[in-house]
Amino acid sequence: MRFGTLFATLGSNDKKNSMLTFVEFIERAIKRNWDLPALSNYREAPMSYGQVGKMIKKIHRALAECGIAEDEKVVQVGRNNVNWAVTFLATTSYGTVSVPILQDFSIPDLENTINHSDAVLVFVSDYIFENMDVTKFPKIRGFISLDDYRVLYSIDEKVNQAFANYNNDIDVSRDKFALKHIAHDRLAAISYTSGTSGHSKGVMLTHGNYATNVEFGTEVIPLKSGDRMVSLLPLAHAYGLAFEFLTEFSLGCHITFLGKIPSPQVLLQAFGEIKPGLVVVVPLIIEKIYKAKIKPAISKGLPKFLLSVPGLRRIVYSKVRKELEDAFGGNFYEVIIGGAALNKEVESFLNRIGFRYTVGYGMTECAPIITYAPWDTARKFSCGYPIRRCQVRIDSPDPMHIEGEVLVKGTQVMMGYYKNPEATAATFDSEGWLKTGDTGTITADGYLTLKGRCKNMILGASGQNIYPEEIEAQINNLPYVVESLVVERGGKLHALIVPDKEKAEKDGLDREKIMIEFEKNQKELNKLMPNYMAISKIELQEEEFVKTPKKSIKRYLYN
């Protein structure tokens, strides 16, 4: 029996109160903040909201002169920068369908995705275009540089002429600036998933899906006009787009784009210089800081001694918290962690030291937000409660104690998968609930805790549900482990481990000694696990696991 009566109403099915359209959020932000800095590339001069408005209108003019019709598809692929951001605002507010593609897609994947999308125009970074064969794109009328809006290649003279005129001035002022009305149910973008199961799908997101996310962000995140933001996650991914750009833009913030994901040194420099009012990261960033810097520092000498004395450990906690806050600029309201599960050891430590963090939950199919709680009401190991206009249900006879699949309804839920009715039908149940593919439990007051992915679950010999992610999180905390994957082989659990060769070499450990170290840790780890979750064998991997552009492991390659 599916539990639904109580939990389906947590969050809200709020359809009584009207919501601004996505384009209205953009227009309002530009008019309210006309003279304030809006966007800048790292260490470059900022562009004001008024300049963004003028740039949007120039792109609108070019699209019209190209003969691009509303609802036609327009691709953008390249590194994060001001032009990428403004192009997204321009194409969606013009009425075309944006197709943002991650810059890390291979050229064959890029070809397949662009052709599958039925796009007619491509905005692309020069360095990507250099490796593209234009003959592979029969429907594309032109390729436009995301670096400077010049035509890279075109089969249509109208495209050449339209973008030759791009730099011509256009009469735009705060009083005259206006964008057309586009209804919530119109298609805004097709966002292609990066495919941990080997198949990329085009998620059809509406203007209402984006408006729901922006409305949520502007209501719960206490940023104001002029506050600063660092954007480091890919804008072509729903998480980075919604919460490092669209929300902050709608609030009048000044957003700085770092381009590609920077080295740790550049990232810390940027946070120190910009001092953002909010930090949005994936768990990997926090986990790397913890494993490389914090854990070694508190595991020896005076810090280790102080942590062993109950009355003194707060001294260490306070010092570590201050250093971690300073690493992110020292001026943030909170650090939002999302995009993947946060390691429990790391989260427990952040919780103990009183670090201002929260873990949210979402997926591309929800553009992306599903649950969230501000840091001061967040609960350890939970990812918050349903946002406004969203309902969450657990497919379980006892949702508070027995995990089941997380089901979602709301105004942020996608239309379906582009040209894939079979996948769309399989993703929604008979009552119209989106099947997330994640399992979890929920409390009486709506806090969601995730267990793992349905498709990754391994059925134990006695029928137990084994979530490999839980075991991998423990393994990844061990010394000399870069990453791990737990798989079933012959009814036994095997741990595939990528060793930290650099650290092992530094400590004088060859492959044989690393294996001895891992086998010793395996025995200790198995003592902490239920018998049915015990690891029977460790296999060392010479190379890191193959990943999607979003940096998720392609698990299907190792099963």
Predicted regions and their residues:
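Conserved ATP-dependent adenylate/AMP-binding module captured primarily in the ANL superfamily
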Residues: Q103-F137, N213-V230, S263-G277
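Conserved AMP-binding/adenylate-forming
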Residues: V316-L448, C454-M457, E472
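Conserved AMP-binding/adenylation subdomain of ANL enzymes
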Residues: A211-R228, L235-K322, N331, R356
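Conserved AMP-binding A3 loop
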Residues: S48-G50, A188-T212
